[in-house]
């Protein structure tokens, strides 16, 4: 590899400093006439000229430039033009007279490619995200497995996170869904429906929307507290008053859901959205319970018992009302996204716990079964003990008494601590990324609505109370603030802000 490195420095223009990656240390680069010394040829990448050596590139025959070097060398052999492929298959344009080949790519990223040709070690460009850098090196025919070990961990971690979040697809889906649901031109009362939709779905769009959002949160909290008090059966509580309060809360939730349903145009898509499914599940048990109780008047005792069990199960679903707060909480939505995106890590964690529980419960059972009045009466009982021990809960209802059993218990607890700690860093990184991505999107939507409102006022010659420059400045400041918080969160979680 040293010989190929010297071959790349075949031009007298490379007698300068070799101390910086950003300087032209790998090839000749200049504004003047291209150099064609010996086996050299010139590539023009993003407006910057680089003189490369065919001898150096021959060590990498499977890359784009390695193939181009073979084509250029073949052109210099007399009588070989008929069997040689066109260089335009490998570059965007070519000037055979000056032996110069053009590429419409980033010249800054190309320097890292040249460093790979010179040393055989590929480093990651700081200024590019992982997916953009991957696109660059794939274009030049370099595999990402060639990335040097000093950059590999950061690169693959950021790449996996970017692919999981899938920013582009998520943004496009949200925009198309936004446009579909916000098309109020079709149907009756478009202006009223649009204003009502803004109040229901955009808490920051107006004072009325903010008041509605606060009232909605209050009703959710009150309904949850009311559900808990109804189950307490305290003597000083008026159950009739609690039932009336339950009816009021359900009426609010029903009206909220019906208004949203009437506002949208694509109602099938509306019913498929997770927040709306949660809203529906929060109110359906109440009406199904009323229906079941009204139809059970003429049933037998056995049938009444079965109906009572159904009613109890339906009442349990009222706890789903807590999930309605996800409409007003970015943190809850981020938690849901994190759980769905970390299913592999969660599955791996459950697998580790299952293996540990199976092993330690069996060992503990055979260590304790000979003790009189032992609580380890069977292996399933030992499963419960191993589960509470590995998760560091330790209820104490089942505990070992022998020395051997206590040693096994110590190993079980220690294994649980180690197993639970393994995926925490990954899940924390995913949660932080989801949270700040949602915050950035919310900020972008708010600023877009403000600019749209300002543009509408300008078009109608209405009184303008804000300045366009101030709106833009607030947008930039909010984005910078969120980026700063994301960077600080990454550092505190053990990550590296090298990529931000």
Swiss-Prot record:
One of its GO terms (molecular function) is voltage-gated potassium channel activity. Detected in brain. Residues 168-181 have a biased composition (Basic and acidic residues). This is Potassium voltage-gated channel subfamily V member 1. It comes from Homo sapiens. Residues 168-189 are annotated as: Disordered. GO terms for cellular component: intercellular bridge; membrane; plasma membrane; voltage-gated potassium channel complex. Its main location: membrane. The gene is KCNV1. Heteromultimer with KCNB1 and KCNB2. Interacts with KCNC4 and KCND1.
């Amino acid at each position: 590899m040293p010989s190929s490195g010297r071959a790349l420095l075949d031009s007298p223009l490379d007698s300068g400093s070799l101390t910086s990656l950003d300087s032209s240390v790998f090839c000749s680069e200049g504004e003047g006439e291209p150099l064609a010394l010996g086996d050299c040829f010139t590539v023009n990448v993003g407006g910057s000229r680089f003189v490369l050596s065919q001898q150096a590139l021959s060590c990498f025959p499977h890359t784009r430039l390695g193939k181009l070097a073979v084509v250029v060398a073949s052109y210099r052999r007399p009588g070989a033009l008929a069997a040689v492929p066109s260089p335009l298959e490998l570059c965007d344009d070519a000037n055979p007279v000056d032996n110069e080949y053009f590429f419409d790519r980033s010249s800054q990223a190309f320097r890292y490619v040249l460093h790979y040709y010179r040393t055989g070690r590929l480093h990651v460009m700081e200024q590019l995200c992982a997916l953009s850098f991957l696109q660059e090196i794939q274009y030049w025919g370099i595999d990402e497995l060639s990335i040097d070990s000093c950059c590999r961990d950061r690169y693959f971690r950021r790449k996996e996170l970017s692919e999981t979040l899938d920013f582009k697809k998520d943004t496009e889906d949200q925009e198309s869904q936004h446009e579909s649901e916000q098309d109020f031109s079709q149907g009756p009362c478009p202006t009223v429906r649009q204003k009502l939709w803004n109040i229901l779905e955009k808490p920051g769009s107006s004072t009325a929307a903010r008041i509605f959002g606060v009232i909605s949160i209050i009703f959710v909290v009150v309904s949850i507290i009311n559900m808990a008090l109804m189950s307490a059966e305290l003597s000083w509580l008026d159950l009739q008053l609690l039932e009336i309060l339950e009816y009021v809360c359900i009426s609010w939730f029903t009206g909220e859901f019906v208004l949203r349903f009437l506002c949208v145009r694509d109602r099938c898509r509306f019913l498929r959205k997770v927040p709306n499914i949660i809203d529906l599940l929060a109110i359906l048990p109440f009406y199904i319970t009323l229906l079941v109780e009204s139809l059970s008047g003429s049933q037998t005792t056995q049938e009444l018992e079965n109906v009572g069990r159904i009613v109890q199960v339906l009442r349990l679903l009222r706890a789903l009302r807590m999930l309605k707060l996800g409409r007003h909480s970015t943190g809850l939505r981020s938690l849901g996204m994190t759980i769905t995106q970390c299913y592999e890590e969660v599955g791996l964690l459950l697998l580790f716990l299952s293996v540990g529980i199976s092993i330690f419960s069996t060992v503990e059972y055979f260590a304790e079964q000979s003790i009189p009045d032992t609580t380890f009466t069977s292996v399933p009982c030992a499963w419960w003990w191993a589960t509470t021990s590995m998760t560091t809960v330790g209820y104490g209802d089942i505990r070992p008494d022998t020395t051997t059993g206590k040693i096994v218990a110590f190993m079980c607890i220690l294994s649980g601590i180690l197993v639970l700690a393994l995926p925490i860093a990954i899940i924390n990184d995913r949660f932080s990324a989801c949270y700040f991505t949602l915050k950035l999107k919310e900020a972008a939507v708010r600023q877009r609505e403000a600019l749209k409102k300002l543009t509408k006022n300008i078009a109608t010659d209405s009184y303008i109370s804000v300045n366009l420059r101030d709106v833009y400045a607030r947008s930039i400041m909010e984005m910078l603030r969120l980026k700063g918080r994301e960077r600080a969160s990454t550092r505190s979680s053990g990550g590296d802000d090298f990529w931000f």
